[in-house]
Amino acid sequence: MKIWIDDEEEKDIDSSQELLEEEPEEDNSDRCIVHAIFFELAFGAVLYLKSATAAFSYLIALAPLVVSTGILGSICYKKNGDMKLFRAICCMSALGIGLQYLIDVKYSPVSEFSLIKFCISFLLSIIFLIFYGMIQKGLKYAFSVYLCMGISVSIYIVLYFFGYDPNGYGTNAWINIHGLTLQLTDFTKVCALFFYSSLFSCKYKENDTKVLLLSSIFFLLNLGGSLLIHELGSFFILFFLHLVMLFMFLPHSFKKVVYILSVFIACFMSVALSFILYKALLPSYQNGTMPSLISKIWPFIRKIYERFSITANINNDPYGAGYQLLQAKKSLWMAGFFGNTVNFNSLPVAESDMAFVAMVSQLGWITGFMYLYFLCRVTCLGLRYTRMRIVKYRDEAIVVFGATIMLFLQAILVILGSCNILPLTGLPI
């Protein structure tokens, strides 16, 4: 069964499907706003059972959270938005905010949850929505493709000179502005969304060779920037986003198949080459005879080897590269349905890479599966919205599709990595 979207197929969609875009669902009710607010309040009670301190901190954040849920929910309902999607996003937000306050109490995080940053991000999202119409119009012009490239390169340059790592892993993905820590690599992901939306909406979409060339240049720019700031975690999300966007929106052709397979093969060959080089260069590294030029790429080779070898056998280095994965394994085993009751809190970076493990450890597997349900719900509804809007609002649908896929990748790669299923979590180099 074909799941990609061809331009020829778009022209053949009948009028009944087009009418579906405009007709709201029968159960697309404003009751979803009430459900979301009730969940936010109920989760505060659950937090109180775990930690009164975390619950009172959550109570302070609950006021702007409930108000924003009501306001944004009303706007979404009046604009005939998907209220089920809105409800799922609100529930995930409440879980995330409450978890951060619980982590601040139970663990020793490098950085604590900031209500100020939460309010600033909320205001920025409002400003973004206000100007999104102008941005959307600009994406139809070819110059926006190069503008997104330039913005991404500028972000990497800023991080190279001014970036630092509050966790002490040696990456340069964060900057500090008057005491507020920002991870600028998140903005490169937003640029990627706009880049692909513009690429498949402007005049270049008619030329497959041009699309592959420009997308490859953008892909290599992100790879080079990620290596420059010693941070591959965000790049892996951009890597999968790159392949998914081309698979879905580039018309099916032999050239497309060859390109995607070539990228996959090159990726696997790079990992295999890293293993070979690690075995070959390890003696010279131990003897201190490694040439200076080779020593510059040695950290990359060693990190890739460590991540894959530790995933294969977590006990190879239990007090080094495998330490946080070993602690995560213990936390998951002791979590139970309702959370850890033996006070095991030796979990590194619980506020970032190990957030899902911390959620299961403190709140139990029931909450963990609830979060996974909301994540799948958001993903399915986002993809459904894309399918409904792709004919008449192509650029908007591409942005929604990209944001949905990127949110899913961001969450699932970290979750599977922290559970030692994928060797991708914690890949600073």
Q: Where are these predicted regions, by residue range?
A:
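Short, Lys/Arg-rich, polar N-terminal cytosolic tail immediately upstream
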Residues: 2-25
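Membrane-helix boundary/helix-loop-helix interface segments in multi-pass membrane proteins
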Residues: 23-62, 69-230, 236, 415-429
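Hydrophobic alpha-helical transmembrane segments
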Residues: 61-65, 119-127, 189, 361-382
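Alpha-helical transmembrane segments and their membrane-interface exit regions
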Residues: 65-72, 126-129, 241-250, 268
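Hydrophobic alpha-helical segments of polytopic membrane proteins
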Residues: 208-227, 232-296
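Hydrophobic, glycine- and aromatic-enriched re-entrant/interface helices and adjoining loop segments
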Residues: 258-367
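Hydrophobic transmembrane alpha-helices and their immediate junctions
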Residues: 365-413
